[in-house]
Amino acid sequence: MASARLLTLCFLVFFTTPLFASDPHPPQLNVSFLARPAPIVQDGSTRLVYEMVITNFSNNKYVLDAVEAKAGTAQFTFGGSALAGMTVRLGAWGQPEGAADRTIDGGRSVIVFLLLDLGNSKAASTIEHMLQVVDEKGDAHAVVPAPLVVSNENPIVVSPPLRGDWIAGDSVNNRPDAAHRRAVLVDGGHAWLAQRYAIDWVQYQTVDGVRTTWKGPEDRNDSYFCYNQPIYSVATGKVVDMADGLPENVPHSAKYAIAIEFNNAAGNHVVVEIAPNRYVLYAHMRPGTVQFKVGDMVKVGDILGHVGNTGSSTEPHLHMHIDDQPSFLAGNGVPYEFTQGSESGPVNANVSSPTAISFGPIGPQRPFTNDYPAENALVTFK
């Protein structure tokens, strides 16, 4: 049995040696992935975003001590509290993050949410991984799954869905409390992450010298600057799903206007097929404002509806994402980039809370083309 010290040495030279010595008692851990990652340019940096599922097929307990990933010449090592914050045990959603999340009990599974920042480098064709686990006796083991093939598809480039000054709320990130990033749901016997690259768009203005997203009673939808703003089609395509007439929520109320179910979480919405297996979803629209019906063709810049607060929504905003199925929740989220805009920040702000936002020094606006904004970036679309 390899000692922990020997395994550490092996771990450091993992990618320079073809294989570890045979383990007489290999951990019965199966490693799979929710989907093949595809590169995305976020705030000027190439990133790979994906999820590793580890299932323990034995009765033994293991602690996930470290995960190493290699994509081309870029190498990443995750361990300790950082790895704990990236790891969730199935059945423990919403529980406090901590070391216990790295424990893989017999017959249980964990998901490790990975985000590899490659900087200016191009994405490699494969990602190699090594997992370091420790058994109940304190012995260390290495698990080396087959290389993960990276998708060679480029992100879809689309036009802006809005005009003016906006905050890109909860765009793809790896925080433990990232709502979109952790929204793994099962439908049809398959685990999906449709909202992997979703963004909640909230408009801001400067009021009395303070940047804020609202002014007036916080329990009124029309107090929020984004409310009733037009939503523009980001691409040419065909409407394949829509809903209108669902009532609006009272902002930050203790309950929704309707009982939230799988099929109404998007509220009033429009889904547009813009390419084979590529669907844009615009969610939470104001009732009575949806302009198209199923089967209609739309073109870039058409007004689809207006920003509202319907479905699973706590205050007015536009939720937008692109996935490979015509569904809000049952699909695989795919990367996309916007043709143009300017970006500053990001800011340290909870855009779902109706409070004035102290942005602090945010630097100058940076014009961009074909880019996806950083989490909570201030984005201007014209």
Features from the language model and the residues they span:
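Asparagine-centered strand-capping/turn motif at beta-strand->loop junctions
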Residues: 54-61
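Zn2+-dependent peptidoglycan hydrolase active-site motif and core
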Residues: 238-286
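Acidic, glycine-rich catalytic/binding loops that coordinate metals and/or anionic ligands
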Residues: 152-171, 179-182, 212, 257-261, ...
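Intrinsically disordered, low-complexity Pro/Gly/Ser/Thr-rich segments with frequent PxxP/GP/PP motifs
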Residues: 76-121
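A structural signal for short beta-strand/turn segments enriched in small hydrophobics and glycine
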Residues: 237-239, 295-307
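Short, solvent-exposed loop/turn segments enriched in Ser/Thr/Gly
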Residues: 34, 44-51
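Short histidine-centered loop motifs in beta-beta connectors
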Residues: 232, 274, 278-301
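Short glycine/threonine/proline-enriched tight-turn/helix- or strand-capping micro-motif at secondary-structure
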Residues: 179-233, 242-263
